[in-house]
Amino acid sequence: MKILKTLTLRGPNYWSIRRKKLIVMRLDLEDLAERPSNSIPGFYEGLIRVLPSLVEHFCSPGHRGGFLARVREGTYMGHIVEHVALELQELVGMTAGFGRTRETSTPGIYNVVYEYVDEQAGRYAGRAAVRLCRSLVDTGDYSLTELEKDLEDLRDLGANSALGPSTETIVTEADARKIPWMLLSARAMVQLGYGVHQQRIQATLSSHSGILGVELACDKEGTKTILQDAGIPVPRGTTIQYFDDLEEAINDVGGYPVVIKPLDGNHGRGITINVRHWEEAIAAYDLAAEESKSRSIIVERYYEGSDHRVLVVNGKLVAVAERIPAHVTGDGTSTITELIDKTNQDPNRGDGHANILTKIVVNKTAIDVMERQGYNLDSVLPKDEVVYLRATANLSTGGIAIDRTDDIHPENIWLMERVAKVIGLDIAGIDVVTSDISKPLRETNGVIVEVNAAPGFRMHVAPSQGLPRNVAAPVLDMLFPSGTPSRIPILAVTGTNGKTTTTRLLAHIYRQTGKTVGYTSTDAIYINEYCVEKGDNTGPQSAAVILRDPTVEVAVLETARGGILRAGLAFDTCDVGVVLNVAADHLGLGDIDTIEQMAKVKSVIAEVVDPSGYAVLNADDPLVAAMADKVKAKVAYFSMNPDNPVIQNHIRRNGIAAVYESGYVSILEGSWTLRVEEATLIPMTMGGMAPFMIANALAACLAAFVNGLDVEVIRQGVRTFTTSAEQTPGRMNLFNLGRYHALVDYAHNPAGYRAVGDFVKNWHGQRFGVVGGPGDRRDSDLIELGQIAAQVFDRIIVKEDDDKRGRSGGETADLIVKGILQENPGAAYEVILDETVALNKALDQVEEKGLVVVFPESVSKAIELIKARKPIG
């Protein structure tokens, strides 16, 4: 077996609309292509020995053990690799259940599709599954050592790229509210929402977190001073820079016991509490100095009581947790080392922040804390004796939490909310020491020890005891108050031909509203009139540029088949999805071999439309019209024929449609007709002589209308939109050169050639074509381009693209010539492979009042060449 290619899908895609995170592994079975599993000695027995948990896979039989029954009866290796890849992820806690395996048009080569949780781990699982299955084929076994290494690697990959627990809590709540989100950086900054409505979080810092409040919270001494000046109880303390000042500082705060900690520490690192004599103070100072970047050490009075963390969000208390330091409880027989090992076996404990709780790590701090209690790692604890392993109660060092939200006294609630406002934090974690949180701090001699920016949520979301608290909900309530949108209107456009023109027209229409419009196209990414990036930008990365931009109010996204197949969509849903047509282009690429398969690719756009939105479908294209059966949204149709049965049936059901009737672009709904504009007054239709441009206008007008735009705005948009080289480069760009005209169009498939041909056939004068085609198209497609050219043009020059796309020089041209001669053996043609030379010759030799039509590889170069020619009177 050999992996030929691996794709990672991150959005709705060809294989599944709902399951966005999929690996597509193109697998060559090689010598196993004709060997089902029941013909491989020992394979079934080895598989259930190595992965007995595969018994839980139902597969097509639909019951426990169903997949293993398929293996025993005989199934092919691609199918088995799919299930093994899923199970390897399951064994490390990454539950992924969806899979598909389909043979391609090349015998023995399969697309193995399976779900993933973590991208890197998902790709690794596929490679490991192939290794495992190959080993079982060759030897009947796969060592448990190798399996454990695979699982360990999977865990590591997942842990390295996983979101932190607090971030995970927030994005899970965002998912529940259907607020879209995306990662912005490796530091786990997350964007919530799209465009102008976006908010950002990093851990539990948010777009609302003020820099002054965060900086103040990081300055422990400054925080204490501000709180003290506000009359809020804080520990008596001082800050020193040198060891020589330590003894005096202890005396200044009232003597022992004291707390010694770094000024700039976090997560409890470098802190020693309840320091009771000089030797302990020396050790505590050294520990704090190791963790301090500034050399500044805080010495504070130690206050008896329990450690509490109070969470305040947007000025309101939302949760309280009592924190217990890492500890073990004796059973009368086990050593402390053994008790720690038993504690760490708790499935809720993981490394770092990987789980609800953190495993207890034995380090110098733990040993020092034990020794202060009179124990060491080999000590056998009496039954029920508790030994603490950390001085502080941070969950990140193995502590646990008990929910106390319902216990806190109302006066303390008021005080904590005041603390957050005094410091200036939108999300504040306030550390309180008090003997009883249910009583006012003034009665218990309690104090505010610290105020933290970016507080952790684990202790509140999953306390060891007490009620879990959904603390992410108030965060999202703050970022997106009731009635505040998180999304911007998204209009997605796909099809074989006309995508770019329709996208640009839609964007132009929306600009009439005064909104900031971002759009992607084959030519470039634009925000309003400003070009962000030139080039083919019709994939998910380009769409994400628009969705990430904080100025964009409306997104119009040209969406080509390549991006859908390669990575899925950048968005989970859209408001309007336009499918213009499906034609025989790009067939044979990406395992899309039939026009029906291509229709399934394009259908993704229609299927992701939100139920409240509209799928705008071409009623004149049966493959597109049939997509309505899969759509969950409302449907609106457009047609060049008002009598189209699909249109008539739709209107009878009070549906909305756009049609070309009596020379007008009109919108129909039920019994009424709304005429948007006469086609001859829409510049892009070339005076009504370009039917395919009228169809594009119908689609754009209908999309804008169903998304709520006023007809007057739409009318203004179509009246002022032109097919100039500046506004729509490569889309019916007509140049008047005085003695003759030149037309530039990026058509590169038979349907596109026919559409341009419908316009060219009406030209009164010589029709001179400079024709070519992409080398990666099928032979039959290139031959058909030649046939169409022979039908349309009086004279033809056949040229080739510089990028041969896998063909040898002259091969593409030969196929086009073959089509020309099949259609018209006496056709006037010649072959000039260089595009520039070919176009120059056509421009030099075209007859007066003639039309030169070029289908260029480089639109910009062709336009530049034509513009350089001065009009000849």
From Swiss-Prot:
Domain ATP-grasp as annotated: residue spans: 224-480
Gene3D superfamilies named among the record's database cross-references: ATP-grasp fold, B domain, Mur ligase, C-terminal domain, Mur-like, catalytic domain
Signal peptide: none
E.C. code: 6.3.2.29, 6.3.2.30
UniProt-listed NCBIfam families: cya_phycin_syn, PRK14016.1
A Pfam family it matches: RimK
Record: residues binding ATP: G495, T496, N497, G498, K499, T500, T501
GO molecular function annotations of the record: ATP binding; cyanophycin synthetase activity (L-arginine-adding); cyanophycin synthetase activity (L-aspartate-adding); metal ion binding
Record flagged with keyword ATP-binding: yes
Name used for this protein in its record: Cyanophycin synthetase
InterPro entries: ATP-grasp (IPR011761), ATP-grasp_RimK-type (IPR013651), Cya_phycin_syn (IPR011810), Cyanophycin_syn_N (IPR044019), Mur-like_cat_sf (IPR036565), Mur_ligase_C (IPR004101), Mur_ligase_C_dom_sf (IPR036615), Mur_ligase_cen (IPR013221)
Keywords: ATP-binding, Ligase, Nucleotide-binding
Subunit organization: Homodimer.
Domain of life assignment: Bacteria
Enzyme class name: ligase
GO biological process entries: biosynthetic process
UniProt similarity note: In the C-terminal section; belongs to the MurCDEF family.
Gene of this entry: cphA
Catalytic activity: [L-4-(L-arginin-2-N-yl)aspartate](n) + L-aspartate + ATP = [L-4-(L-arginin-2-N-yl)aspartate](n)-L-aspartate + ADP + phosphate + H(+); [L-4-(L-arginin-2-N-yl)aspartate](n)-L-aspartate + L-arginine + ATP = [L-4-(L-arginin-2-N-yl)aspartate](n+1) + ADP + phosphate + H(+)
